[in-house]
Amino acid sequence: MRHWLAAFLALCLGFAAHADGERAGDFDYYVMSLGWSSNWCVLEGDARGDDQCDARHNFTFTLHGLWPQHEAGWPSYCRTAERDPSRGESEAMADIMGGAGLAWYQWKKHGRCAGLSAKAYYAAMRRAYGTVIIPPIFAKVSKDLKVPASVIQDAFLQSNPGLQPDMITVTCDRGMIQEARICLTTDLKFRKCAGDVVRDCTLKNAILGAVR
């Protein structure tokens, strides 16, 4: 009863509700989160010497995660009988995620809720990442820029036929472009984002750090 009341109040107040330990596979759609790598490095990665931030990579938007989502709220840390991924399976995701540690954490928090094995979830993340064309112009960002956050969304819309404005939201963190979040059906097709997912950044001069 208390769980139901908390969820009801969250909906009434317009807040997103999440629940830990839900049953795996019980969700409505995915949110795929793509992070601008160099900004993440400035905010977090550089301080810990993360390999993702080494200039040899030339990362633009990397895959942050593929998150099971309810029409209102989201599950996390679900109960599952599936085994955790091996170190090798996680390391194999570094080419699109920047590192094995993030891949494993995404499995632990979100992947267990997908109702898939770890191997199948990693494969789904790779397929999801492959459904989106990262606008080629981003690879040419050779110096820090200040841009309207809406430019990021527009670039994705132009590069991805079928992607509509209500299917993507761009977020900022501490004045920097943070992520492009794209909503996908359970079979990884573009779909409209529910209201609690939308976090549109309205900055007119958000920092887009140089590729590295």
Walk through the language-model features, giving the residues of each.
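Positively charged n-region of N-terminal signal peptides that target proteins for export
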Residues: 1-3
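Bacterial N-terminal signal peptides
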Residues: 6-14
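Boundary at the C-terminal end of the N-terminal hydrophobic targeting segment
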Residues: 17-21
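N-terminal regions that are enriched for targeting/export leaders
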Residues: 22-51
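Domain-level detector of nuclease and nuclease-like folds
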Residues: 33, 45-212
